[in-house]
Amino acid sequence: MLRRAVRERRQFIYKRNQELQEAKLNEKRRALRKALEGNKELNKDLQEDSQLQKDYKYDESRATQEETETNLDDEYHRLGEREPKVLVTTSREPSSRLAQFAKEVRLLIPNSYRLNRGNIVVGSLVEAARANDITDIVILHEHRGIPDGLVISHLPYGPTLSFSLHNVVLRHDIPNTGTMSEAYPHLIFENLTSKLGKRVKTALSALFPPDPKDTTPRVVTFANTDDYISFRHHIYAKTGPKQIILSEAGPRFEMKLFEITLGTVDMVDADVEWKLKPYQRHKRDVLAE
């Protein structure tokens, strides 16, 4: 079973690397075509790529439409076909506050299961999750009793997204929350419009069941502002034809993405797809265009 999982993972990673290389080549072809059509100077990378310039005469015979983009979210090709099964757990020896936060996350995500971590190592955790047809693993971390990290690992092959958590307020600390509804929630994603933002949006939406009922009173919001994703959970009730009352159900927190790896959480040698580099020169917002 272990050999089979390793073989399938290698085949998946090999196929994905081929798609990524083809995507980079298509991007260069588009840039070259755009520069020639606009009579603009080629950038340095295109000037030094002599093979690309030689092949351009063959590329001209292609249709003028954009080349087919590789499906970078191929890991989520079954998204919407079936309901996800999510495993929620914590780091080892969690504090009472982190354990309470894990309980609230379990109630937040339909069809999820909470596991008391104990002494289970990550490798055994992932292996057991695969054997039980788990689609995603959510691991919560803390620092001195304050939740400060969230890891989402998609099974069976990844990717794994790592977030830092800020300003965490538990549902337990919000007054007059009442009993949490476990109906499938509506999802709202705000300002996740870049390629990386859409990647994060797909990973987050994969945690929740597709096609909630129109009458469900729950709304879950992921709103991006300056690369901080604000998470909010509300319950609404209609009081008239065009009036509703909105109440916060909790918990609430801010998330900041700092790494995406092309593998599951147990793969220490997985390729890094994206990593936050605070001192690197790039545009300020990477999750929005």
From Swiss-Prot:
The keyword rRNA processing applies. It is found in: Nucleus, Nucleolus. GO terms for molecular function: rRNA primary transcript binding; snoRNA binding. Keywords: Nucleus, Ribonucleoprotein, Ribosome biogenesis, rRNA processing. Pfam families: Brix. Residues 42-82 are annotated as: Disordered. Residues 42-65 have a biased composition (Basic and acidic residues). Residues 84-266 form the Brix domain. One of its GO terms (cellular component) is Mpp10 complex. One of its GO terms (biological process) is ribosomal small subunit biogenesis. Its main location: nucleus. Gene3D superfamilies: Probable brix-domain ribosomal biogenesis protein (3.40.50.10480). Component of a heterotrimeric complex containing imp3, imp4 and mpp10. This is U3 small nucleolar ribonucleoprotein protein imp4. The lineage of its organism: Eukaryota, Fungi, Dikarya, Ascomycota, Taphrinomycotina.
